[in-house]
Regions:
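Conserved ABC ATPase "signature" region
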Residues: 162-177
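Conserved ABC ATPase signature
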Residues: 181-191
């Protein structure tokens, strides 16, 4: 893990702006040549929050949360559910952990390293081999087909064989949508494509932000099974967020945001 597979092409990108504008899991693939984080441990074991709080909540005195203003640890190999009400900072939490935003108070650290000290190249490296993210808003490319959205990432990571990807499409009931543009698919179908894309890379933690909000019970259950099978095979931790509807899994700990 952490090494570029042989015979896998890559796009050299010296533009920080381009990396930032791409979804984190896609943008990561554009930096195979980036230097490693100094002292970076190849496997990330813990994500820790200490008195973290979105700055927008700083003047509020009514915060009642099991995450904000608390000391919280997410450990590799474990399964967590973060339940939230609207406007409580659920997506902000994901954005902080994935490095998209830093407008928070307190400390967030990976294996005791304060993430505020990470530079863009460091985040690229983390997203390449340690963090995968299923966005609530998905961030798929509408002009590309379902398979192309997955392949654009997998071609760069070289992590999964085409046969495995197609098997996931079939299992999730979208095997007939492989070559259909994303713009012509329902949001629920797009959610399944986004999940597959999130799985075609190595990761120590997977953040799934409302992954089944538009799925029926059967597809939600299948997605959960596929997600957990891949996470277990990598020994990874999984953090699922929800505003009510969530994947029925054996969560080891549930936090009320």
């Amino acid at each position: 893990r952490g090494r570029r597979p042989e015979n896998v092409g890559f796009v050299r990108c010296d533009s920080v702006a381009l990396i930032r504008c791409l979804p984190s899991d896609i943008g990561a693939a554009y930096a195979w040549e980036s230097e490693s984080i100094e002292g970076f441990i190849e496997i990330m074991d813990k994500i820790e929050l200490k008195n973290a709080l979105p700055e927008v909540f700083a003047l509020r005195d009514d915060i009642r949360s099991e995450i904000w203003h608390q000391e919280v640890t997410f450990e590799r190999g474990h399964l967590y559910l973060v339940e939230a009400g609207s406007g409580t900072g659920k997506s902000s939490l994901c954005s902080y952990i994935i490095g998209y935003r830093n407008d928070y108070q307190g400390i967030i650290s990976f294996d005791r390293r304060n993430i505020r000290n990470y530079k863009v190249k460091d985040w690229v490296e983390l997203r390449k081999r340690s963090l995968s993210h299923l966005f609530q808003e998905l961030r798929l490319f509408p002009e590309l087909t379902a398979y192309e959205n997955v392949a654009i990432k997998n071609n760069l990571t070289g992590f999964k064989k085409k046969k495995q990807i197609e098997a996931w499409f079939d299992a999730l009931g979208i095997g007939d949508k492989l070559h259909v543009p994303i713009s012509r698919m329902s949001f629920g179908q797009q959610q399944r494509v986004a999940m597959i894309r999130a799985l075609v890379q190595p990761f120590d933690f997977l953040l799934a932000d409302e992954p089944i909000s538009h799925l029926d019970e059967e597809n939600g259950r299948t997605m959960g099974e596929i997600m957990m099978e891949e996470a277990r095979s990598q020994g990874a931790g999984v953090i699922v967020t929800s505003i009510g509807k969530h994947i029925a899994l054996d969560y080891e700990k549930t936090f009320r945001l």
